[in-house]
Structures are given as structure tokens and as C-alpha cells.
């Protein structure tokens, strides 16, 4: 993406997230969408991440070892006119777990505008 899309200082950061074991029926992290552009996530071999399917069912995300999970954020959804949709997700921590996340979004002072998508994406 061109610099004007994300500003001079895009808001990007990495976070190591620790989830303690939660009681049955409770979420370690409640259902939410990431607000930024996109998130790259490593689960480190312990499951618990779930994504909400269009039919309302929660799906366990069980990637192969070393795989990177890509979550679409609300800013990418807005910029593509809902072509890409933010992934509603949560964490059910049946055992202690760690994940590493890279969050990417625009400079907080940047005005966002819809992207001009090719007609084939309409």
C-alpha cells in the first residue's frame, strides 16, 4: 500500500499474549473484531482460538504447527466496502496458552478512504 494510505507512522506492534486457564463456559477473551487493518497470529501449539462462522456457529481454529493465522480487521472491511469482512473471534482457554500477535493499522491521524477495487471484486 502507498504511504498516504497508512500515514507517515503506521500503528504496528507485536504483542505476546498470555491467557490463563478459564472456567468451563467462560471465554479467556470475549468475542470481538480486531479494529485495525489486519492481525497476524501464532498460537504456539495450544488451541482455544475460535472464529464465528456466517451461520452463527463457533469454529475451532486448529492450524498446522508454525502456520500464521490472518485476521481481517474492521479498517480493512471499511476500506474495501465489506468485500473483506472482519473476523469475529474469541479465545476459550481450557489450559494456559500463549499467542504472538502482530497488529497493523494506519497512523492514528490518517483519514481513511475506500479503496478503488477492480470491477471483478464488486
Question: Where are each of the predicted segments found?
Answer:
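C-terminal flanking tails of non-heme Fe-dependent oxygenases
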Residues: 1-122
Amino acid at each position: 500500500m502507498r504511504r498516504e494510505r497508512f500515514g507517515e507512522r503506521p500503528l504496528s506492534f507485536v504483542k505476546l499474549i498470555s491467557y490463563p486457564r478459564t472456567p468451563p463456559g467462560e471465554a479467556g477473551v470475549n468475542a470481538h473484531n480486531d479494529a485495525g487493518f489486519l492481525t497476524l497470529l501464532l498460537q504456539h501449539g495450544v488451541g482455544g482460538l475460535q472464529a464465528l462462522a456466517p451461520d452463527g456457529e463457533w469454529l475451532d481454529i486448529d492450524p498446522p504447527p508454525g502456520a500464521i493465522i490472518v485476521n481481517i480487521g474492521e479498517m480493512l472491511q471499511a476500506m474495501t466496502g465489506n468485500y473483506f469482512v472482519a473476523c469475529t473471534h474469541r479465545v476459550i482457554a481450557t489450559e494456559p496458552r500463549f499467542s504472538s500477535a502482530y497488529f497493523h493499522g494506519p497512523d492514528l491521524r490518517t483519514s481513511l478512504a475506500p479503496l478503488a477495487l477492480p470491477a471483478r471484486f464488486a
